[in-house]
């Protein structure tokens, strides 16, 4: 599968007199239809990276290729039309008096025909389960509902790429999981490419690959399973240790023969049943 995004030795500084660059020779790619999670401590360069991809910032050196085109000042708006951004606080994105108006806003700015706008808005709201809230004021929605509307606004633009900048961090665990599953379903149905900046284990677990950033550089890329198998190192990377990994580690320390590495709760349940049946 070909890369839809590629960064080659990208360097960026916010200030000329910085002792260390914000990004220092960052190189990685994102495949078409892939879900890539980007993790790392605050200040590691995560948000700077996605702002460079969206053309909100300009690299000092290196190159960024999006959907086969080198990102430049002359084509930045064309590139942005291929990318939908969803931020941590959806209130900062709302501009419409109603949910319907807000989702339609970007489409109206593109000069799309009224009937097409109506069809796209209805379809996008249906995808995120918010079709019954069309006439509601965004300010009266819950945090999870607001994020669903923000995602609908992005999806209605028919982008090839969705970027989530800690989009689930302000939600409760239940709302967070529901939103992640909604995004996954949309990604699977429409072959969207998803990049998510996150500290949430459920979000990381659903991704295809995980990119770890540290001090403005790429520390590693791996599958979620490979990342979770790093055990106590996860704390240093800004993640908690998954519950199932902690259970496996404790069982191994007690001498029980159980497979090492990350297991889902269902996989752990199966392993425990097999272990008990042999006792």
Curated annotation (Swiss-Prot):
GO cellular component: ATP-binding cassette (ABC) transporter complex
Entry keyword set: ATP-binding, Cell membrane, Membrane, Nucleotide-binding, Translocase, Transport
Binding positions for ATP per the UniProt entry: 40-47
Regions that span the bilayer: none
Family in the record: Belongs to the ABC transporter superfamily. Energy-coupling factor EcfA family.
Primary enzyme class: translocase
SUPFAM superfamilies attached to this UniProt entry: P-loop containing nucleoside triphosphate hydrolases
UniProt keyword annotation of Amino-acid biosynthesis present: no
PROSITE patterns: ABC_TRANSPORTER_1, ABC_TRANSPORTER_2, CBIO
Gene3D superfamilies: P-loop containing nucleotide triphosphate hydrolases
GO molecular function: ATP binding; ATP hydrolysis activity; ATPase-coupled transmembrane transporter activity
Subcellular location(s) per record: Cell membrane
Protein name stated in the entry: Energy-coupling factor transporter ATP-binding protein EcfA1
Function: ATP-binding (A) component of a common energy-coupling factor (ECF) ABC-transporter complex. Unlike classic ABC transporters this ECF transporter provides the energy necessary to transport a number of different substrates.
InterPro entries named in the record: AAA+_ATPase, ABC_transporter-like_ATP-bd, ABC_transporter-like_CS, ABC_transpr_CbiO/EcfA_su, ECF_ABC_transporter_ATP-bd, EcfA_1, P-loop_NTPase
Pfam family, one: ABC_tran
Boundaries of every ABC transporter domain copy: 5-240
The encoding gene: ecfA1
Assembly and oligomerization: Forms a stable energy-coupling factor (ECF) transporter complex composed of 2 membrane-embedded substrate-binding proteins (S component), 2 ATP-binding proteins (A component) and 2 transmembrane proteins (T component).
Membrane topology: Peripheral membrane protein
EC number: 7.-.-.-
């Amino acid at each position: 599968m070909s890369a839809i995004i590629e960064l080659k030795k990208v360097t960026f500084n916010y200030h000329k007199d910085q002792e260390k660059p914000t990004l220092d020779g960052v190189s990685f790619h994102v495949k078409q239809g892939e879900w890539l999670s980007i993790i790392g401590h605050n200040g590691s360069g995560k948000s700077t990276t996605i702002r460079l991809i969206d053309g909100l910032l300009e690299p000092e050196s290196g190159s960024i290729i999006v959907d086969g085109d080198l990102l430049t000042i002359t084509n930045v708006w064309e590139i942005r039309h291929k990318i939908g951004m969803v931020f941590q606080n959806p209130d900062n994105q709302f501009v419409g008096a109603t949910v319907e108006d807000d989702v339609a806003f970007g489409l109206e700015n593109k000069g799309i025909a009224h009937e097409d706008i109506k069809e796209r808005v209805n379809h996008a709201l249906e995808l995120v389960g918010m079709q019954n809230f069309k006439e509601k004021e965004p300010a009266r929605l819950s945090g999870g509902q607001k994020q669903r509307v923000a995602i609908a606004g992005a999806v209605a633009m028919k982008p090839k790429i969705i970027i989530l900048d800690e989009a689930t961090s302000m939600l409760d665990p239940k709302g967070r999981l529901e939103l992640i599953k909604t995004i996954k379903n949309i990604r699977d149905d429409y072959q969207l490419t998803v990049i998510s900046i996150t500290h949430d284990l459920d979000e990381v677990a659903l991704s295809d690959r995980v990119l770890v950033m540290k001090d403005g550089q790429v520390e590693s890329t791996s599958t979620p399973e490979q990342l979770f198998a790093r055990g106590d190192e996860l704390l240093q990377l800004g993640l908690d240790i998954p519950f199932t990994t902690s259970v496996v580690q404790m069982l191994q320390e007690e001498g029980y023969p159980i497979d090492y590495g990350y297991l889902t709760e269902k996989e752990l349940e199966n392993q425990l049943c097999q272990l008990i049946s042999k006792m």
